[in-house]
Regions:
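Extracytoplasmic
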Residues: 1-211
C-alpha cells in the first residue's frame, strides 16, 4: 500500500480479503511452464507430478538450491525403483531438439562407488542415463580437476540432448528418474537456443498450475 499525503481521511481501514487453502499440504505439483526467450527453466520443487518408490517420499529441502530448494527421495536407505519427477511444459512449434541441463547437489558416491545415476526422458521416449558423480572422488586424476572445484561450487550440472516428439498442443513432459539414492535435484533447464551460462542457471520461466 502506498501513500502520497499523510493526512488521507480514510473512512475505514480494511484488511485485504484472505483466501486460505483447506489442505495446504496437498497443494503441490501440477505446474505447467511456458517458454521464455529460447529456454524453459524450472525449479525442481515445481514439478507436475511426483511418483514415490515403495517406502519412500519425495521431500523438498528448502534453500538447498542456489535459487530455491532441492528435491530428494527419502529415506536414502531405500531403493528408488519406480520413483520419478515429471515436469510439464510447452515448447514452440518447430523445436525438434533440446539440450536438457540437470542441476543436482554435489552428492558423493556413498551407495554405489561407480557413481549415482538418473534417467532423463521426454514424453515417454527412450531414456538417457546420466552418471553425475563417478569422478567426484579423491583419486589423483580427479582431486584437483573435479573434486575440489565441485565441492566449492556445491552443484553438478549435466547436459543431455533429446529429440522432441510431435505434439498437437505443444505440450511435453520431461521425466527424471533416480536410479540410485541420495540424488537431490535442484534445477532443470530445457534449452532450445536461448540459454546463457549463469551462476543461477537463468531465471525461472513463467508457469501456472492445473487445478
Amino acid at each position: 500500500i502506498g501513500y502520497t499525503p499523510w493526512n488521507d481521511n480514510f473512512p475505514a481501514d480494511k484488511l485485504p480479503e484472505i483466501y486460505r487453502i483447506s489442505e495446504p499440504e496437498k497443494a503441490v505439483g501440477s505446474y505447467v511452464f511456458e517458454p521464455s526467450n529460447g529456454y524453459v527453466a524450472i525449479e525442481a520443487e515445481h514439478y507436475f507430478k511426483a511418483v514415490n518408490a515403495p517406502e519412500t517420499e519425495w521431500t523438498c529441502i528448502p534453500y538447498m538450491g542456489r535459487t530455491l530448494s532441492g528435491m530428494a527421495l527419502m529415506p536414502y536407505t531405500k531403493n528408488t525403483d519406480g520413483a520419478a519427477l515429471s515436469y510439464k511444459m510447452k515448447l514452440p512449434e518447430g523445436v525438434t531438439k533440446v539440450t536438457v541441463r540437470v542441476v543436482v547437489k554435489s552428492t558423493l558416491a556413498f551407495r554405489n562407488l561407480d557413481g549415482h545415476r538418473y534417467n532423463v526422458a521426454l514424453d515417454g521416449g527412450e531414456a538417457v542415463t546420466v552418471n553425475f558423480n563417478s569422478d567426484l572422488n579423491e583419486k589423483p586424476e580427479n582431486i584437483y580437476s573435479v573434486f575440489y572445484p565441485t565441492v566449492a561450487s556445491r552443484v553438478v550440472e549435466k547436459k543431455v540432448e533429446l529429440d522432441v516428439p510431435a505434439s498437437e498442443d505443444g505440450t511435453h513432459i520431461l521425466t527424471l528418474s533416480p536410479l540410485d539414492p541420495g540424488i537431490v535435484f535442484e534445477k532443470i533447464v530445457v534449452d532450445f537456443g536461448g540459454y546463457k551460462p549463469s551462476y543461477l542457471f537463468m531465471n525461472e520461466s513463467p508457469s501456472k498450475r492445473e487445478l
